[in-house]
């Protein structure tokens, strides 16, 4: 039907007869000659329709609407020197049409313009409602082609490393850990339910028990959770698992995988190995386990310096088991007013969103003099001031912002303020140097965190992470006592403050798995009911194994420079988990519900 893609033609094709298919991007009449920009996935080419080629051909071209689907036959020729368009890859040539067939006309009104020549922004709601049209836009086509290149590169890399692709079930059982499941009622097994998988976690471990040794899958996963710009109810993971490899080997292999993707997509050679921080280091220095290391303003714990200070907000927080931390804003005296730090100010509001009651501040003046509220200035002695300025590195003109209280709240508040100021003050580099892509492994996570509401431990990642051998010891009788303080052999890959993926070495000892489930409050009978198939498998010669999963939607978002993963997915959902194009989710008939033995109790408030 066609000989070439529109965007494939170059000067080497001059004097060739070609047959092209595509959409009318725009059509214009210049002095009795009609120029059609014909667009397909590969790009755009200028078609020239001269009346000398026939009146019927010219009349057909005159009546064309944008987005009409055409087939063009013609001769490739050079453009006149004054008509060369350096912005187009095909800008040195054009096609003189000698045949034109309308394959499908546009009969309705277009809700927005698709043309590459129209930079008019379109509301996202309208784009999502007419996604089939939105996908024709150059930006969206480019994003999806880049997504394809990313996944193709990953597949080739893993296959070259001896991995095989295996599909795991989409209809599985609900488990108590993790986010809320999407549930699917079974018609055949009345009263019972499937769950859509949040990840292939258990199945990929069972594949290792089954002796497949190296597995990967481009997996569809589902989580019924509140959404934000980089979350979707259904998403794509590059899921990887391997046997007989230690943590160091797994990290190095996946560094090479990421480097291969960045080389193929961006043409960038990433420096290897990636830096590493322990979880405790990340929390101490950045207040988060997903630190953005492209800029400074790291957190400083100044509790030891200020613990005996007369300012009760500081000394009281420390005495209660909390901490006082600060960040130093370079030249902050000139950039940030007191109004912004006090209640109602934008910086105060950022801290408050993280649960902090407020922020304290010190302004550093010449000769190490300081300005602050009286309660701080009057209660900070010269020794404390000297130690504070030395530890923070603050100099004249700098602003020190303090958080005081529970350490977790202080970390969260100062992390939020740090990110806010990093963006606002232009501290984040945007040029194409190594600082643009700051990869980082965060390792040595705690096995568990406290659920204060329920007064019980929860797995920080999931309950299948293997604990650190040094923390656990070799005596199974001591495991229950040591587990709550143990570190997990877990690792997350972070890029510019965003988590790209994470994983761990897995528990391959059945007794240890039972004890971990007990530690998170799962009774043995319930553990057997929920995870008996896994524990049985671990008793049948399970090999040491581990793996990880990368969020492909987020990776593609970063590679394309988009702000939302919705612009890297062909048919995404909104932040209300709706598809505006198909109007899913939607109601179903009573007959369908009756077949499933399901009754809806929903009452429409209208």
UniProtKB/Swiss-Prot annotation:
Disulfide bridge map: none
Gene3D superfamilies given in the database record: Bira Bifunctional Protein, Domain 2, GAD-like domain, Nucleic acid-binding proteins
CDD domains membership: AspRS_core, EcAspRS_like_N
Gene Ontology MF terms: aspartate-tRNA ligase activity; aspartate-tRNA(Asn) ligase activity; ATP binding; nucleic acid binding
Keyword rRNA-binding (UniProt): no
Pfam families: GAD (PF02938), tRNA-synt_2 (PF00152), tRNA_anti-codon (PF01336)
Domain of life: Bacteria
Record site feature (Important for tRNA non-discrimination), residues: 30
One record GO biological process: aspartyl-tRNA aminoacylation
A single cellular component GO annotation: cytoplasm
The keyword Aminoacyl-tRNA synthetase is assigned to this record: yes
Keywords on record: Aminoacyl-tRNA synthetase, ATP-binding, Cytoplasm, Ligase, Nucleotide-binding, Protein biosynthesis
Annotated L-aspartate binding sites: 177, 223, 461, 506
Catalytic activity field: tRNA(Asx) + L-aspartate + ATP = L-aspartyl-tRNA(Asx) + AMP + diphosphate
Subcellular localization, as worded in the UniProt entry: Cytoplasm
Region (Aspartate): 201-204
Binding site for ATP: 223-225, 232, 499, 551-554
Entry-linked InterPro entries: Aa-tRNA-synt_II (IPR004364), aa-tRNA-synth_II (IPR006195), aa-tRNA-synth_II/BPL/LPL (IPR045864), Asp-tRNA-ligase_1 (IPR004524), Asp-tRNA-ligase_1_N (IPR047089), Asp/Asn-tRNA-synth_IIb (IPR002312), AspRS_core (IPR047090), GAD-like_sf (IPR004115)
Entry's EC annotation: 6.1.1.23
Function: Aspartyl-tRNA synthetase with relaxed tRNA specificity since it is able to aspartylate not only its cognate tRNA(Asp) but also tRNA(Asn). Reaction proceeds in two steps: L-aspartate is first activated by ATP to form Asp-AMP and then transferred to the acceptor end of tRNA(Asp/Asn).
Family recorded in the similarity comment: Belongs to the class-II aminoacyl-tRNA synthetase family. Type 1 subfamily.
Record note on quaternary structure: Homodimer.
Protein name: Aspartate--tRNA(Asp/Asn) ligase
């Amino acid at each position: 039907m066609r000989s070439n893609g529109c965007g494939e033609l170059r000067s080497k094709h001059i004097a060739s007869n070609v047959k092209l298919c595509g959409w009318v991007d725009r059509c214009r009449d210049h002095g009795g000659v009609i120029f059609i920009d014909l667009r397909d996935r590969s790009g755009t080419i200028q078609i020239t329709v001269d009346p000398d080629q026939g009146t019927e051909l010219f009349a057909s071209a005159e009546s064309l609407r944008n987005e009409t689907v055409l087939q063009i036959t013609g001769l490739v020729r050079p453009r006149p020197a004054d008509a060369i368009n350096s912005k187009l890859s095909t800008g040195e040539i054009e096609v003189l049409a000698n045949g034109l067939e309308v394959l499908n006309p546009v009969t309705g009104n277009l809700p927005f313009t698709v043309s590459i020549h129209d930079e008019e922004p379109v509301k996202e709601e309208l784009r999502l409602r007419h996604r089939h049209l939105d996908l024709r836009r150059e930006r969206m086509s480019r994003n999806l082609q880049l997504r394809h290149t990313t996944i193709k590169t990953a597949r080739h890399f893993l296959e070259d490393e001896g991995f095989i692709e295996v599909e795991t079930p989409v209809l599985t059982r609900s488990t108590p850990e993790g986010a809320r499941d999407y549930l699917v009622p079974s018609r055949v097994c009345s009263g019972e339910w499937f769950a859509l998988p949040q990840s292939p976690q258990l199945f990929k471990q069972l594949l290792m028990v089954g002796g497949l040794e190296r597995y990967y899958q481009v997996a569809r996963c589902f989580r019924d959770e509140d959404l934000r710009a980089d979350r979707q109810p259904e998403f794509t993971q590059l899921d990887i698992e391997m046997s007989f490899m230690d943590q160091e080997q797994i990290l190095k292999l996946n560094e090479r995988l990421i480097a291969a993707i960045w080389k193929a997509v961006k043409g960038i050679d990433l420096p290897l190995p990636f830096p590493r921080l322990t979880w405790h280091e990340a929390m101490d220095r950045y207040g988060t386990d997903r630190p953005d290391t492209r800029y400074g303003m790291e957190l400083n714990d100044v509790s030891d310096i200020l613990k005996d200070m007369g300012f009760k907000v500081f000394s009281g927080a420390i005495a209660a088991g909390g901490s006082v931390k600060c960040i130093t804003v370079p030249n902050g005296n000139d950039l940030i007013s007191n109004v912004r730090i006090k209640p109602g100010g934008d910086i105060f509001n950022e801290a408050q969103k993280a649960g902090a009651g407020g922020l304290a501040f010190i302004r550093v003046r010449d000769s190490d003099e300081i300005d602050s509220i009286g309660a701080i200035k009057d209660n900070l002695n010269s020794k404390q001031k000297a130690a504070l300025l030395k530890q923070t590195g603050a100099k004249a003109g700098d602003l020190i912002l303090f958080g005081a209280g529970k350490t977790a709240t202080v970390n969260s508040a100062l992390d939020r303020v740090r990110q806010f100021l990093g963006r606002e003050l232009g501290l984040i580099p945007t040029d194409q140097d190594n600082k643009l892509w700051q990869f980082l492994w965060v390792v040595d996570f705690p096995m568990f965190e406290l659920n204060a509401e329920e007064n019980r431990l929860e797995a920080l990642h999931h309950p299948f992470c293997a604990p650190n051998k040094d923390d656990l010891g070799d005596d199974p009788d001591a495991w229950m006592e040591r587990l709550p303080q143990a570190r997990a052999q877990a690792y997350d890959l972070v890029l510019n403050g965003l988590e790209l993926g994470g994983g761990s070495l897995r528990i391959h000892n059945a007794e240890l798995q039972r004890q971990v489930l007990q530690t998170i409050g799962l009774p043995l009978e319930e553990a057997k009911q929920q995870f008996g198939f896994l524990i049985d498998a671990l008793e049948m010669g399970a090999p040491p194994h581990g793996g990880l999963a990368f969020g492909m939607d987020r990776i593609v978002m970063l590679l394309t420079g988009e702000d939302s993963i919705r612009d890297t997915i062909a048919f995404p959902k909104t932040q209300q988990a709706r598809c505006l194009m198909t109007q899913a989710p939607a109601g179903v008939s009573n007959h369908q519900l009756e077949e499933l033995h399901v009754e809806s109790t929903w009452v429409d408030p209208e």
